[in-house]
Amino acid sequence: MAKSFVPLIAVLCVLVLPLAAMAVGTPFHIEGSVYCDTCRFGFETIATQYIRGARVRIVCKDRVTLKSELVGVAVTGPDGKYKVAVRGDRQDQQCLAELVHSPLSRCQEADPGRSTATVILTRSNGAASTRHYANAMGFFRDEPLRGCAALRKRYLADGDNRAI
């Protein structure tokens, strides 16, 4: 009885092998965006300006050795978005998209709360897609634009003007 299953199992293994090889060699595609926080609110608003030419890098850190490795770099396009292909499954490494540089002279200070974004670079988490999205990252403008106080009122809860 067991001998009758051996050819079937062998055929299944041969058929699955190319799929496994393709998955290992297929790069991950990371997408994200970079913006200038023109009101220094710490989040995107209708006054947000997306940055063309901002530089971003993808860095992975091994959780055991704590060694960091640069695995990708990108520059944002006209809409402030970047795309970068990263080869290799990073399994249990912690990977981050990090801001490197803003070409806008009045928007150079990285927002400490939005200067990095976690990216998942493993096929062992159940996600079938190789396309992954990083949270938007931002730089603060040196001085807020005029009209930011009025904009802040729009974003506050009804009647909560204490924060202004």
From Swiss-Prot:
GO terms for cellular component: extracellular space. The keyword Disulfide bond applies. The keyword Lipoprotein does not apply. It comes from Arabidopsis thaliana. Disulfide bonds join 36-107, 39-148, 60-95. The gene is DFC. Pfam families: Pollen_Ole_e_1. Part of a three-gene cluster containing FLC, UFC and DFC, which is coordinately regulated in response to vernalization. Not regulated by FLX. Belongs to the Ole e I family. It is found in: Secreted. Its main location: secreted. This is Protein DOWNSTREAM OF FLC. Induction: Epigenetically down-regulated by vernalization. Residues 1-23 form the signal peptide. Keywords: Disulfide bond, Secreted, Signal.
